[in-house]
């Protein structure tokens, strides 16, 4: 069941859930619980010029973005991680990409909360 969000394709999640709404609710719940903190870590590290810290935090969220079919977000976080690993040569560009990423992810969070609520109603 693909969502209306252009950067959210839950096909893989639904496939491995194999009909288990509980798995879907739990997976979405963990993502929604952990991701804001990781995004805050990235933001703080970028603001502080801590490129190694920003890259490490970006790496932590990258797999989850792929898991939820957030391909644009995954591509952006990969670019951010690479730019930070390279020493943050262009901080303004990194910040702009991060701001773009957070806007996209905020939309996905909203949609994921809706999906989670729908699935919880089935439990």
Feature names for model-found ranges:
Residues 2-7, 27, 32-33, 38, ...:
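Amphipathic, coiled-coil-like alpha-helical segments
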Residues 11-18:
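Helix-loop "lid/cap" segments that line or gate small-molecule binding pockets
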Residues 19-23:
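Active-site flanking loop/helix segments enriched in acidic
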Residues 25, 51, 55, 95:
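Conserved HATPase_c
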Residues 42, 46-54, 68, 87-89:
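Short helix-adjacent coil turns
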Residues 61:
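An anion-binding catalytic pocket shared by soluble metabolic enzymes
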């Amino acid at each position: 069941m693909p969502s209306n969000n252009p950067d959210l394709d839950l096909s893989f999640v639904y496939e491995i859930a194999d009909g288990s709404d509980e798995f879907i609710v739990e997976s979405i719940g963990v993502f929604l619980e952990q991701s804001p903190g990781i995004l805050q870590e990235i933001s703080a590290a970028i603001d502080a010029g801590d490129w190694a810290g920003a890259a490490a935090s970006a790496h932590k969220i990258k797999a989850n973005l792929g898991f939820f079919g957030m391909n644009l977000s995954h591509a952006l976080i990969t670019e951010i991680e690479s730019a930070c690993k390279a020493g943050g040569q262009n901080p303004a560009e990194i910040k702009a990409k991060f701001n773009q990423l957070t806007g996209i992810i905020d939309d996905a969070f909203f949609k994921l909360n809706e999906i989670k609520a729908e699935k919880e109603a089935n439990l």
